[in-house]
Each structure stands twice: as C-alpha cells, then as structure tokens.
Amino acid sequence: MTAQTQCQDSQVLLTMTNVCKSFPGVKALDNANLTVRSHSVHALMGENGAGKSTLLKCLFGIYAKDEGEILFLGEPVNFKTSKEALENGISMVHQELNLVRQTSVMDNLWLGRYPLKGPFVDHAKMYRDTKAIFDELDIDVDPKEKVAKLSVSQMQMIEIAKAFSYNAKIVIMDEPTSSLSEKEVEHLFKIIDKLKQRGCGIIYISHKMDEIFKICDEITILRDGKWINTVNVKESTMEQIVGMMVGRELTQRFPEKTNVPKEVILQVENLTAKNQPSIQDVSFELRKGEILGIAGLVGAKRTDIVEAIFGVRELIEGTIKLHGKTVKNHTALEAINNGFALVTEERRSTGIYSNLSIEFNSLISNMKSYLTPWKLLSTKKMKSDTQWVIDSMNVKTPSHRTTIGSLSGGNQQKVIIGRWLLTQPEILMLDEPTRGIDIGAKFEIYQLIQELAKKDKGIIMISSEMPELLGVTDRILVMSNGKLAGIVESAKTSQEEILQLAAKYL
C-alpha cells in the first residue's frame, strides 16, 4: 500500500480548526488548522515564529487556546495539562529531552504510574514491561541503566518508548534528528514506521527537507500564525513547500559562489590532541576568501579540530601558522587576540546568555575594547556596536534591550556571528551554523558567509548536512575517527564519495 493510498484509507484522529492564540502584543495563531490521520506521518512546517510550537502546545495542554475547536477521536477536547493529554493518548517527544538523568531507564518510562505489588513497586513487572516495549521497537538499552550514561539518540528512543507505553494515538516529534548520526536516523525512521503500522498518527517537525520528503505523507504549512495549505508529499515539490513557508519564491537553495580564494592565510600541520580519542595528525591549508567545509560522521572528531585551533583543546603536537607565522593559542582569549573566532555547535548552551539582552550578547567577546582610560564602560560605543550588529546582520528585533532568548534561532545565530565580527577576526570557524534554523533564515546565513568570504575572511564550516556543505563551501575536509580521510573540491565531489571517505578509518 502506498503512503498516498494509506493516507486516504486511514481514520482521522485529530482535527484542529480555526485555532487562535494571542500573547501581549502578538497574535501567535490566527485561525490555524491541522488534521492528522492514523497510519501516517504529518509534517508541520513553517519558518521559526510561524506558530508551529504554539499550535502543538495548545493541543498538549501547555497553552489554553483563545478560540477554535480541537477534536480528538471525534470528540471535543480541551486538555488543561500535558499529563491529561498523555493519559488520553497524545504524547510529545521534546527537542530538549525531558528525562530524569539520575534515575534508571525503566523509572523514567513509568514515572508517576509504577506497577504495584501490594504497597510496593513491582520492579520485576516494570523490568518485563519495559523490555517488552524495547524488544518491539528494537531498542538495545538495559532498562536498569542510568539515563545519564546514555547517548542522545538512546535518550530519544526512551522518550519514544514512553509514548509507546501510554498507547499514544498521536505522537509529536520536534526536531528528533538534530543530534543523531545517519545510522541513528535510520533506526529512528524504522521506529516511526512501526508506530505507523500500529495505527499512530505522527506529527513531525523538522527543517530538514530531505527527511520530510522521505518519511512524511502529508505536510501542513503555517506562516505568521496562519494556515497556508495542507498538501500530499507525493504531489508536491521542495520548491513549492519552501515558497509557501516563506511567502515568496525561493529560486535557489544556496547563494551563487562568485568569490575566488586568494593566497594561503592559515596552515595547520600535524595537529594531535592530548586527550584521546581525538584528532590525530591533521594537516590542511586555508586560503583568504575560502570556505572550507569539514564533514564526517558523528564521532569523527570534527569539532575537536576547531577547538584545538581555538585553544580550548590541548595539543601534544602540531603547528598553527597565520600568514606564515606560528601562533600558539593556549586559551580562547589568546585565539581571539590572534585573530580567530569560533561560533560553537550548541547555540543554546554555549553560544548565548538566553536571559540577557541582545546588547550584552553582542558585546561579551569584546568587552575590553569598551573600557575608557578611566576604566569605565563607554555606553555610547557599546550602543553603537550593538546597533551595527543588528543592522549589518539584519537581526529582526524590536530593541537592542530585547532578551536574545526571545529571538528565533536564525536571529540568535546572526547576533553570535556579529559578536565575533566585532573582534575583527581573520579566521572565522562555524560549527553547525544552521542547526535548528528554518530554511529562509538558512539562506540568509549562507549569504552572510559568502559576503564574509568576499571580504577575505578565511572560513571553516562544520556541518552534518551534506547538501549544505556541497552548496556553500569551496573544498571539503573529510574526517574519519579522528583522522584526515581526504580533502575534496566541492564542485567535483558527491555525497557518495564523502561518505566513503568518512568510513575510511572505522
């Protein structure tokens, strides 16, 4: 049975009609609609701020809707809490995993509803029931293991197993593959297929178009809180979906590469990190105006390269030369003073102070430059530089005093890049710069990277998205298990060649 036929034959599980929700000064949802069927995966798409999360929070009992109707299994519902939604068969696998890390896997699975034997918890039954679910979903984790010892992908599987244990009819997945390797993604897709076969309806949120077209049956697009369209995946193109998301035709996914790299600016020779497993004997060159991508599977130690260059990972061997002169970056401060900048992978945990202002987050890497001879801060220069970040990075914000945590992922990333540009770096290193960013904002980040290359910055860009590396970079350095597997020209290589190199030392 094809996905299309299956979707047509399946039962309607959920209907959300004309749902409205307002916050002070903002109409987050304006007559939004969503219909989810059994035996199907339904993508909910839209740029950051389109209303996707708000709509699902109204369903899940986190927010109360202002207007509209929600029908679940044909009956009107208005859940007051997420616990009520769970008990009625609606489960959410959050992007920020919601597990108690210091307890066991099976404790997390049955938290608040332990099986009892008289007045005591029946641990034997809890173990058996957990193992039965894991066997059905092909999850290879010991139910007695502490959650803190699991990988991110294993934690994600536990969240899905928890939904399974509630006998959920609707399972909501928010960016479930953002931290997974290709192998782990394939395992997740197999579990999603099992949920479909069981009769579940899966609501799938992702910015990764390739995934949407691989596993989803239908797509609902929201823009500015409004329902735009619901389409069948088999009858749609990527360009049509993107056009509906952004409200305009996006004629190209990546900006045209017009810059020609110049002379060598950075030489990295025989880098080997102190604490193994890590990078071993890595050498490469970077030219002025060049965008060098770094590819590899999860665990390939891509991030270790930029951390070693930036002075936050100790080396036992290796030389770094800038303009032919050896530089020693023992700390991040030394690296900044030597002309290096690093936009880290985990934006929320290591890139921003989410409860503080855009101004603070724009200036924090360069505070020394705002000191007057009397050791006071020059508020005039601080305000001027913050405004430069907002204007030059095209940050959408009502004020420089707005907390950065209230901005979309794309705007947060622009502030971070702007912050580093204030330090006037010659080498800009970007680790997963578009992770968790919608497709319209991604294009703006790509344009920004191209503009910086035109200004003769040397740029190193790590990404797990192969089309992104091929579309944005000039050359791609491929890592495999901490070793350099090869360097290829982006215009002359393929995903297949890169994957072969990535597996070279496994």
Swiss-Prot record:
Keyword Oxidoreductase tagged: no
Nucleotide-binding as a keyword of this entry, yes or no, is: yes
Q: What catalytic activity does the UniProt entry give for this protein?
A: D-galactose(out) + ATP + H2O = D-galactose(in) + ADP + phosphate + H(+); methyl beta-D-galactoside(out) + ATP + H2O = methyl beta-D-galactoside(in) + ADP + phosphate + H(+)
Compartments in which it is found: Cell inner membrane
Cite the InterPro entries for this sequence: AAA+_ATPase, ABC_carbohydrate_import_ATPase, ABC_transporter-like_ATP-bd, ABC_transporter-like_CS, P-loop_NTPase
Cite the binding residues for ATP: 46-53
Where the record annotates domain ABC transporter, the positions are 14-249, 260-506
What family does the entry list?
Belongs to the ABC transporter superfamily. Galactose/methyl galactoside importer (TC 3.A.1.2.3) family.
State whether it acts alone or in a complex, and with which partners, per the record.
The complex is composed of one ATP-binding protein (MglA), two transmembrane proteins (MglC) and a solute-binding protein (MglB).
Its name, as the record gives it, is Galactose/methyl galactoside import ATP-binding protein MglA
State the organism of origin: Haemophilus influenzae (strain ATCC 51907 / DSM 11121 / KW20 / Rd)
